[in-house]
A protein has these predicted regions:
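Flexible, acidic/Gly-rich N-terminal and inter-domain linker regions that tether
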Residues: 1-105
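Conserved small/polar residues in nucleotide/adenosyl-binding loops
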Residues: 313-320
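Conserved alpha-helical substructure of the radical SAM core
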Residues: 125-155
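Canonical Radical SAM [4Fe-4S] cluster-binding loop centered on the CxxxCxxC motif
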Residues: 100-137
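Conserved AdoMet/S-adenosylmethionine-binding subsite of the radical SAM
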Residues: 146-155, 160-311
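Alpha-helix N-cap recognition
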Residues: 41-44, 222, 320
Length: 324
């Protein structure tokens, strides 16, 4: 039955207005309902106190208000980072992370259940892709975390489970809802979307001319090493991926971030650092060096701190911004 109900949390204002009118209500009700969903973040129709009980029943008969169920919260003793496990209405579970900074609260959300990209160092892809998340399921991760901590979320990164550009249309609707001034109203400049390098989608996103930051999971300085770490590189050459990043900057004026997980003995040599700086030479970019997270299903290990320092120093010497 749920499949036949309309997912109104995924609707923009125009669609919601059309839907409410089709149910026999007046246009102004749509604005009230949109506010209940996207400003007050209610979890049920019954919480909409200025809507008549009669029309609430009509809504229940025709629509569903997607609401994630908080299954578990793990809090880091080191820095207070909170990892959330949310249950979806089909029984699948997704992860989100809250990071608290001096400049505000940042949430990292998932865009899919599982992932089909197969990156060798990533645990999220071990069981493949189950499905893409709806816009409502993406944005409700932010709403639920905001309610849990009782504070405003100011920054969002789409870097959790899944390849965001593999769920492209839902991602765009999520961005529209997230940045709507009638909703939670998070600035496009405070949103980062990651990709493993789906070149046609990167170029398509560039043409949307949004003010969001694009983060490319690069993780290697040449094509052969990237193919060994990331199966997506069999479809897209590393130079085509970097060219797509240059195109993104040309279209949007937004500096691209390169994510580079340092894997001990695999991609962390001085030669790798030299190749990396040559690869992105002349670009207005940011390089984020990340010691890889070991997972039991793979035998990759972190680079030691001395090796990381060498990579960082080399990139700085070549006027490429590295971040540790």
């Amino acid at each position: 039955i749920k499949e036949q109900l309309t997912d109104i949390k995924s609707m923009n204002m125009d669609e919601l207005t059309e839907f409410i009118i089709s149910l026999g209500e007046k246009k102004f009700r749509a604005k009230q309902i949109y506010e209940w969903i996207h400003v007050k973040h209610v979890d049920s129709f019954d919480e909409m106190t200025n809507i008549s009980k009669k029309f609430i029943q009509v809504l229940k008969d025709n629509a569903i208000l997607i609401s994630l169920k908080k299954e578990e919260v793990q809090v880091s003793k080191l820095d207070g980072t909170r990892k959330y496990l949310f249950a979806l209405d089909d029984g699948n579970v997704i992860e989100s992370v809250l990071m608290k900074y001096k400049h505000g609260n940042s949430v990292c959300i998932s865009s899919q259940v599982g992932c089909r990209m197969g990156c060798r160092f990533c645990a999220s892809t071990l069981d493949g892709l189950v499905r893409g998340l709806r816009p409502s399921e993406m944005i409700d991760q932010i709403y639920q975390i905001g309610k849990d901590i009782g504070e405003r979320i100011s920054n969002v990164v789409v870097m959790g489970t899944g390849e965001p550009l593999d769920n492209y249309d839902n991602l765009l609707r999520f961005i529209e809802l997230l940045t709507d001034e009638n909703g939670i109203n998070i600035s496009q400049r405070n949103l980062t979307v990651s990709t493993c390098g789906l070149v046609p989608r990167m170029r398509q996103l560039a043409d949307e001319k949004l003010a969001i930051t694009l983060a490319l999971s690069l993780h290697a300085s040449n094509q052969e090493k990237r193919k060994a770490l990331m199966p997506v590189a069999n479809s897209y050459d590393i130079h085509d991926v970097v060219d797509a990043c240059k195109y993104y900057f040309a279209q949007t004026g937004r500096r691209v971030t390169f994510e580079y997980s340092l894997v001990g003995g695999v991609n962390d040599t001085a030669e790798d650092a030299a190749e990396l700086s040559a690869l992105v030479h002349g670009m207005n970019c940011h390089i984020n060096l990340i010691p890889v997270n070991p997972i039991k299903e793979r035998d990759y290990v972190q680079s030691n701190k001395g090796v990381i320092a060498v990579s960082y120093t080399h990139l700085r010497a070549h006027e490429t911004r590295g971040n540790l």
